Amino acid sequence: MQKIRPDLDIGRNIQRMRYLNGFTQDQVIARLNLMGIPISKSTYAKLETNRMNIKVSELLALARIFHCDVGEFFKNLL
């Protein structure tokens, strides 16, 4: 049976998708806020560095912003 990797990769995958889309953290935060997801710069930074758990609503919003499937954030967890 494969071991499941720590949730560390979720934050890394969020950061990877942000880089691939050419966004800064501030741009992502602004888009999240426009979508009704109130998030500060420090909170967003904590999500990317795995110092805070992400909410499902935030994950769904990020998938819309990055035009990707939610599964992208779970790559390399297995």
Tell where the protein language model's regions lie, with residue ranges:
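Helix-turn-helix DNA-binding elements, focusing on the entry/boundary residues of the two helices
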Residues: 14, 25, 41, 56-59
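Short amphipathic recognition helices of helix-turn-helix/homeodomain-type DNA-binding modules
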Residues: 72-78
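DNA major-groove recognition helix of helix-turn-helix/homeodomain DNA-binding modules
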Residues: 51, 55-72
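Short alpha-helical DNA-recognition segment
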Residues: 22-46
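Residues in the recognition helix of alpha-helical DNA-binding motifs
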Residues: 17, 31, 47, 76
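A short, Lys/Arg-rich alpha-helix, primarily the initiator
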Residues: 1-20
